[in-house]
C-alpha cells in the first residue's frame, strides 16, 4: 500500500498508510490526544478529523488547548444554528448568507422574508433544537464537489449561489455535511455536533448582504460558544455589563450627544453636557502639548486636491475620501481625511534650520471620512471627527530621544485619565518581504533598533509584530480593550520616511548645507475626540471623575424659599472658583432629588437646610456613597479643588 509522509511541528517525520485520517494519526500517538483533537491541519489547511489525508506535508493536530480551536467550535456553532433554523417549520425556506466565527462568538446572516424574520423571541425554540442536534452527535464531514454540483445543491438559496458564482474558476469547492444539513465551507470544523455543547444565542441585528447598503437587509443572528458552560455564563455576564457601559445608551441617558437622520448619518450632535466633557479633554490635551514644546496651529478643513495627490492619499485612500468639489476655475477642493499634509505645509512654508528641530506641530484638526452607513456607530465610528493630531520633524540622529519624549507624555496622559489596561506593540517591516516597504534598508534597521532601545531604556514591556509596519516606517501602537471587549488602538507613534521625500522637505544642517532631510513622526495621544469620549464614557460607566464631569456639584436646598439665597450664594462661590455647579429648583421630595443626582452621576451633592444656613456649612454626599458629611464651605471648596487638580486620583 502506498504511504504518505507527515512532518510534525517538532520536526519529526512519520509515514502512514494512504487513506489515514487525522483521528487515526492522533490515535497512533495517544488515546488522550485523540480525545481532545478538534481538527487536523495539512500544509496550512484545515482537515476534518474524519476526512482522509490525501497528501504528504506539514501536519498539525489542533486540540482544545489551542486558542484557534475555539474559533473552530464557534464556526461549527454557526452551522448548528443554521441546521436548527431549517428544522423549525416557519423557517423551513429560510435563506442563508455567511456564518463565520468572530471574536467572542459567531453569527449567521439569514433572510426569511419581510415580516417573518428571526427575532429574540425565537431563541428558546432555536436553542432547544440546537441542543437536540448536539445529542444526535452528527458527524461533520467535508467533501469536494464541482461547481455544477454546488449550484444544484444550493439552487434554492440565492445568497449561496452568488457566493459560488463569485469563486474563481479554478478554485476548489468544498462542502461540510452534518446529517441532512449542507454548508458551503472551506473547513475548520469540529468532528461532530456532539462537540458543540455549550452555547448561547445573544442578539439579532440588521446587516446588509456583504456590507453593501444597495443589497438586501438580512437578519444577523449572533451567538457565543465555549468549551465550558461556566465560560458561556461569564461571557453573558460580561455582555450584560457591556450593555450597561454602552456609550450610546449612557450618552442618551446623560444627555451627552445624539445622532439624527435629519442631521445626517455619522454626524453626532454634542449636547451641552457632552460638549463640556469634550471641552475639558481638548483643553487638557492642548495644555499638555504646549507644556511639552508643541506649537498649536489651525489649518483648513478643505484643501486643494493636489495636496493629497502629492501625499499619496488620493491614490491609496480615495475610497475613504469624500468626492472633490469642483470650484469651476480649475481648482478642486477636498475635505481632508488626514491632517499631516497641512502640517507639512506649516513646516515647509519657509526655510528651516536644525536649530528649530525638533519642530513639534499639533492641532485639534477636523477631518472627514467616507464611511459606509453600516459601519457607523455612535461616537466611535463617524464621518466627521476631530483628531488630537501632532507631527514632529526631527533630525534622524535625534529620533530615539524624540520618541521617548512622546511616549513619556503619552503615559502621563494615561495616568491622568486613570487608563491602566493597555499594552505596547512595536510594528516592524517583514524582513522576508522588504520590497513591500520604503526602500532604505539602513534607515529601517537603524530606526527599528532605535525604537526598541527607547522602549528598553524606559523599562516598558512590549511585543513585537513583524510585517505590521506601515509602508513608510515602523510604529508603536498602544492597544487597549474597550469596556465592550473590543481591542482598539488608543495611541500611535508612526515614523515616516516617505512624506518628507514626497514633499522634498529639507533643513539647513549643522554643516551649513540646506540638503538635510528630516524624519517625520506622526503621533496621536488620545485619537479623535469622538472615539476617545466614547472610550471614556464606557470606561467610567458615565460616572466621570470630577474634573471631567459636566456638572460637578448639584446643590439642593431643603426649601427653595427659605434656603434658596444661601444655595445661590454657594453656587456663585463655586463658579467663581472655576467649578461647575447648579441649584436644584424643582419642587419635589428631597429623597427623589438626591436619587436623581445619583442617577445623573454628579460627583458631589450638597444639601442645604436651616442648620447649614445658620452655620455657613454644607452637607456633602459624594457619588456612590450613602453617608453624608457636614463641613464648612471653605473645607468643601478645598476638598473639591484638590479633587479636580489631582484628576480625581487617590492621594499618593
Curated annotation (Swiss-Prot):
Which keywords accompany this UniProt record?
Answer: Aminoacyl-tRNA synthetase, ATP-binding, Cytoplasm, Ligase, Metal-binding, Nucleotide-binding, Protein biosynthesis, RNA-binding, tRNA-binding, Zinc
Keyword Protein biosynthesis attributed: yes
Q: How is the cofactor bound?
A: Binds 1 zinc ion per subunit.
Q: How does it assemble?
A: Homodimer.
Q: Which GO terms describe its biological process?
A: threonyl-tRNA aminoacylation
TGS domain mapped to chain residues? 1-63
Family matches, as SUPFAM superfamilies: Class II aaRS ABD-related (SSF52954), Class II aaRS and biotin synthetases (SSF55681), TGS-like (SSF81271), ThrRS/AlaRS common domain (SSF55186)
Provide the residue positions that the database annotates as binding Zn(2+): 340, 391, 522
Q: Where in the cell is it found?
A: Cytoplasm
What organism is recorded for this protein? Answer: Leuconostoc mesenteroides subsp. mesenteroides (strain ATCC 8293 / DSM 20343 / BCRC 11652 / CCM 1803 / JCM 6124 / NCDO 523 / NBRC 100496 / NCIMB 8023 / NCTC 12954 / NRRL B-1118 / 37Y)
Species classification: Bacteria, Bacillati, Bacillota, Bacilli, Lactobacillales
This enzyme catalyses:
tRNA(Thr) + L-threonine + ATP = L-threonyl-tRNA(Thr) + AMP + diphosphate + H(+)
List cofactor names only. Zn(2+)
SMART domains with a match to the protein in the record? tRNA_SAD
Record protein name field = Threonine--tRNA ligase
Q: Which GO terms describe its cellular component?
A: cytoplasm
Which protein family is named in the record? Belongs to the class-II aminoacyl-tRNA synthetase family.
- Region annotation (Catalytic) ranges: 246-545
> Main role?
Catalyzes the attachment of threonine to tRNA(Thr) in a two-step reaction: L-threonine is first activated by ATP to form Thr-AMP and then transferred to the acceptor end of tRNA(Thr). Also edits incorrectly charged L-seryl-tRNA(Thr).
